[in-house]
């Protein structure tokens, strides 16, 4: 029987915390502020289900284009096409 190709197929590693990172995430990460035009890395925090983006975009880098409620609109280029992802601060890391 063929395996299903559901939306979370192949995400065992992306949606699993390392043993040292298990439990609740640091609250500073969820309330971090980002400015428009700032470069950010998309990294899913498995401990935070809200504001998560599709796992296919995990690991990409984009530019913050503004806020939508408590979340941020991040522009990325996926396969030569510009896309806008809406994601909360818990899943964003500032590029240094």
Swiss-Prot record:
An example Gene Ontology CC term for this record: ribosome
InterPro entries, alphabetized: Ribosomal_eL21, Ribosomal_eL21_arc, Ribosomal_eL21_CS, Ribosomal_eL21_sf, Translation_prot_SH3-like_sf
Chain segments carrying region Disordered: 1-66
Keywords: Ribonucleoprotein, Ribosomal protein, RNA-binding, rRNA-binding
Biological process terms in GO annotation: translation
UniProt-recorded Gene Ontology molecular function terms: rRNA binding; structural constituent of ribosome
Record's function text: This is one of 5 proteins that mediate the attachment of the 5S rRNA onto the large ribosomal subunit, stabilizing the orientation of adjacent RNA domains.
UniProt record similarity statement: Belongs to the eukaryotic ribosomal protein eL21 family.
Assembly mode: Part of the 50S ribosomal subunit. Interacts with protein L18 and binds the 5S rRNA. Has been cross-linked to L18.
Protein name: Large ribosomal subunit protein eL21
Organism: Haloarcula marismortui (strain ATCC 43049 / DSM 3752 / JCM 8966 / VKM B-1809) (Halobacterium marismortui)
Organism lineage string: Archaea, Methanobacteriati, Methanobacteriota, Stenosarchaea group, Halobacteria
